[in-house]
Design a protein with these regions (language model features):
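Terminal low-complexity/charged segments
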Residues: 1-167
């Protein structure tokens, strides 16, 4: 049996627009894009604390490369376990910009943000333990970027370059 969600994305966007009118944009009735990433932490706090939203579960954070736009994005997937609704928020930044960490609001953001930095180079301000999580500290670059050149060797060991399944 499929349960009807208590709040749909249009309702969620109206709540966000009432406080952050110039900072969010509804895209194709599927996700909300935060256009003013400087307001992200305040928006995230509202998502968690607003009685009509109550997003208590950060399911995952994914990062992506915008390609020719020279932007890098983060997609946050939230769930309200008590109100049974879901939301995806996306934020895009350039290489010189950073996003506020939300690890103080959702502990699960800690490692997800570190992975987004390690693989895609997205920086998170005020992260309590901002360092690489998968690659060595001296690894050069961020391997999931479309413009990344895989090195021939790392510390004298050959680095495999078989991209058959993902290029």
């Amino acid at each position: 049996m499929v349960r009807k969600l208590n709040v749909d994305i249009l309702d969620i966007h109206k709540i966000l627009e009432s406080k952050f009118s110039e900072s969010t944009e509804l895209i194709d009735d599927k996700f909300i894009k935060v256009s003013n990433f400087n307001k992200w932490h305040e928006i995230a706090l509202l998502l968690k604390d607003n009685n009509k939203l109550k997003f208590d579960y950060l399911m995952c954070i994914s990062s992506y490369d915008g390609g020719d736009k020279k932007t890098y994005g983060v997609a946050y997937n939230f769930k309200s376990t008590s109100l049974n609704h879901y939301l995806e928020i996306r934020i895009e930044v350039t290489d010189k910009e950073s996003i506020s960490s939300i690890s103080d609001l959702w502990g699960s953001a800690d490692w997800h943000e570190r992975e987004a930095y390690d693989m895609m180079g997205i920086k998170f301000e005020n992260h309590p333990n901002f360092k690489r999580i998968l690659l060595a500290d001296d690894w050069d670059g961020h391997p999931l970027r479309k413009d990344y050149d895989t090195p021939e060797y790392y510390r004298g060991m050959p680095v495999p370059k078989d991209k058959t399944y993902w290029e």
